[in-house]
Structure formats: C-alpha cells, structure tokens
Amino acid sequence: MAEFPASLLILNGKSTDNLPLREAIMLLREEGMTIHVRVTWEKGDAARFVEEARKLGVATVIAGGGDGTINEVSTALIQCEGDDIPALGILPLGTANDFATSVGIPEALDKALKLAIAGNAIAIDMAQVNKQTCFINMATGGFGTRITTETPEKLKAALGGVSYIIHGLMRMDTLQPDRCEIRGENFHWQGDALVIGIGNGRQAGGGQQLCPNALINDGLLQLRIFTGDEILPALVSTLKSDEDNPNIIEGASSWFDIQAPHEITFNLDGEPLSGQNFHIEILPAALRCRLPPDCPLLR
C-alpha cells in the first residue's frame, strides 16, 4: 500500500465499544498507516484535539461520530490559523449521519476510514450564525427542530432516524408554527413557518431532503420554508415528492436574516440555538474535506 501522512481520529465517546471500528483501525495500522485516536468526553474536547493534531503535523483530522461530532471538528478546523491546516475526514457513527450520507460516505467502516485518510481533499463551504456558531450541514427551525432536540436518546439508539418521525407523531397536539420574517439576496418572506431548512447540505432529521438542491461548494445557502396551518400535512410532505407543493417557499442566497416576535429555536447540525434574531452567512471554501469522487453535493 502507498504511504499516507498520519491522521488523528476524534472519536465520540459513545462509540468506544465499536469492535468493527477497532479492527479496521488495527488493520490499517498493520498496513503501515499512522492513525492517532482521541476520545471525546465533554464539550470542547474536539477543539483541544484539533490543536493537538496541528502539533502532531497530521494531514487529516477524522470526525468519528454523528452530525454533532462533524460539526465540532469542522468548526475547530476553520478556526485554525496558518498553513498546513489538516483536512476533514468523516467516519459516520451517529444516529442519523445526515451529512455523511448525503455526500456519499460509505456505510462500511473500513471503506469510510480509508476514504477519510486517502480520499481527495476538496474545499467546501461552511455556514456561520450570528458571527459565532457554525454548521456544516443544515440549520432547521420549526416543529422539526423541536422533534430532533427532544427525541429520547434511547429511542434514537433503538430506531435510528425513524425515531424522529415516531416522536414527531407523538407530539402533534403540542406543536405550533413559528411566525417570522426572512430576508436574503433578492428574497423576502413573512408568515407562519411549520418547517424552515437553511442548507449547506441537503438532508436533516434522519434522511429528510429539506434542501434537495443544495451544494457544498457553490457559495450559497439553500432555503426551504414549509407553510400551512396543520402540522401533519407538512410532515407528510417531507416524506414524499413535493415539487408541486404550494406550501413550499424556496430561495438561495449567500446570507439570510431571520427575525421573530418570539423566541424560536434552530437546530445547527444537532445543536440547538434559540433567539429572536439570526444572521446566517456562508463561508466559502472554509475547509478541505476528503470526499468520494462521485460526491453528489459538488458542483
């Protein structure tokens, strides 16, 4: 096997007992690859491990976990200064793995690990909210956000992405639309939103294609708003073809401003952020990510 530069895997603590992953790492080490492994325990660990990766001089920092882990690692990488910033590798080990799935990361751990180490590093965009918090995949608001943030961990562990749908159906009687105003480049809308999706990536909530036209290297955010008076039809519309749905508003812009008369919550790659005012902007070519050659989210 050809020689490859060293990598550092930042592994979500929930995945430490993954025997197939351990075997895949040991096999690649036996083939001559240098793979450092660090395990997260609390918030902030990923950023500290990225700093360590810089000191070790690795070529790739691999995020081993779900969308939240990928978010933490990628956010830490774009905050690095100087030259020789490591590329991002992705090892999908979460509940939904929305970003990894949409960009075509293999489900097989050995194949995903090899791609994360030896794949072509391509410059991709990220998004920033209120000049602070970032997301690599999607910001979602409305009832979908409340579903994903409130779904019990045991249900997610047992059922994966389907757990979000089940929990949403259980909560139908308590979920209400959010009134807000959204502005962007050549875009303005005001009304009651059942679901808001602002995507750098395409899917969220366990496989729902909220922003099916999004690309991760076009310098744009894709916006989709599901409007209407009833929650259930909106949920159903996200599970089927909705190209002709009159209750869907779409837009594209390098930034969006959102204002609401009451507090609303956005889910940023799995992390909730609440407020009344949000400025969301794209950060073009913010980091390099190792992706398959046929990645569908590249222009």
Curated annotation (Swiss-Prot):
It comes from the Bacteria. The keyword NAD does not apply. The keyword Lipid metabolism applies. Its main location: cytoplasm. GO terms for cellular component: cytoplasm; plasma membrane. One of its GO terms (molecular function) is ATP binding. It is found in: Cytoplasm. Its cofactor is Mg(2+); Ca(2+). Mg(2+) binds at residues 215, 218, 220. NCBIfam families: lip_kinase_YegS, PRK13054.1, YegS/Rv2252/BmrU family lipid kinase. This is Probable lipid kinase YegS. It comes from Shigella boydii serotype 18 (strain CDC 3083-94 / BS512).
